[in-house]
Amino acid sequence: MTAIALSIAGSDSGGGAGIQADLKTFSALGVYGASVITAITAQNTRGVTAVEDVSAEIVSAQMDAVFSDLDVKAVKIGMVSRRETIAAIADGLRRFGKRAVVDPVMVATSGDALLRPDAVAALIEELLPLALVVTPNLAEAALMTGRAIAGDEAEMARQAEAIMRTGAHAVLVKGGHLKGQEATDLFFDGDTLVRLPAGRIETRNDHGTGCTLSAAIAAGLAKGVPLIEAVSAAKAYLHAAISAADRLEIGQGRGPVHHFHRWWKD
């Protein structure tokens, strides 16, 4: 049977992040992708110029349509900017007995804010207890824990432990913004702390990296891969996609990663 994954996220008109990046990732990894759109963004490699939220009612209707027909094996949640939307998503997950990969998208790669302040508490209170794994970057982890942005791996670990106390099953704190030759993420499931290093890649093409990573984790879970293995494989896929990104030459700003690097010829 074909593995199916669902992305609940915003649409990126430039195609590099959000729903578009998620569906590309699912396809690249051999998983059928379904989608629930939470917002429509006017966005390109240079930034976000406008955001139109989709109503909570339509978000619920999309979830009902997908879950009532498709045998969804994994769910990934990305951009959800409104408290009402978060409540609708949490309700849908509970009704259909689903947990999710939660990418707490708060700030775009360009630096534009994507999550309203009153929605941060709702995300922590309603979505994190339903998370199989939550994947914050350093700024998001700091915002979620009320601490300063981590400057080293020891503080990353402390913030991972704090996020676990929200009820999440596991946490992956992404350390790509730390200084150094490595981009090291920390995975914590309440018992074991796993260090996941990778060589740092110097490139302007890093738009949608967080979306791609969380979608790749969901793709692995949809195929029945254990969580830590899905996380490790997703990080390897993202690293390869970033390494190949310069071949695309898309946009005038921070371009997308190369989701189909294994298949497209130069």
Swiss-Prot record:
Keyword ATP-binding: yes
A GO biological process held by the record: thiamine biosynthetic process
Alphabetized InterPro entries for the sequence: HMP/HMP-P_kinase_dom, PM/HMP-P_kinase-1, Ribokinase-like
A single GO cellular-component term on record: cytosol
Top EC category: transferase
GO molecular function: ATP binding; hydroxymethylpyrimidine kinase activity; phosphomethylpyrimidine kinase activity
Pathway assigned in UniProt: Cofactor biosynthesis; thiamine diphosphate biosynthesis; 4-amino-2-methyl-5-diphosphomethylpyrimidine from 5-amino-1-(5-phospho-D-ribosyl)imidazole: step 2/3; Cofactor biosynthesis; thiamine diphosphate biosynthesis; 4-amino-2-methyl-5-diphosphomethylpyrimidine from 5-amino-1-(5-phospho-D-ribosyl)imidazole: step 3/3
Keywords: ATP-binding, Kinase, Nucleotide-binding, Plasmid, Thiamine biosynthesis, Transferase
Pfam families on file: Phos_pyr_kin (PF08543)
SUPFAM superfamilies associated with the record: Ribokinase-like
E.C. number: 2.7.1.49, 2.7.4.7
Reactions listed under catalytic activity: 4-amino-5-hydroxymethyl-2-methylpyrimidine + ATP = 4-amino-2-methyl-5-(phosphooxymethyl)pyrimidine + ADP + H(+); 4-amino-2-methyl-5-(phosphooxymethyl)pyrimidine + ATP = 4-amino-2-methyl-5-(diphosphooxymethyl)pyrimidine + ADP
Residues engaged in binding 4-amino-5-hydroxymethyl-2-methylpyrimidine: Q43
Residue spans crossing the bilayer: none
Entry keyword Manganese: no
Function, in words: Catalyzes the phosphorylation of hydroxymethylpyrimidine phosphate (HMP-P) to HMP-PP, and of HMP to HMP-P.
Matches recorded under PANTHER family: HYDROXYMETHYLPYRIMIDINE_PHOSPHOMETHYLPYRIMIDINE KINASE THI20-RELATED, PHOSPHOMETHYLPYRIMIDINE KINASE
Similarity annotation: Belongs to the ThiD family.
Protein name in UniProt: Hydroxymethylpyrimidine/phosphomethylpyrimidine kinase
Gene that specifies this protein: thiD
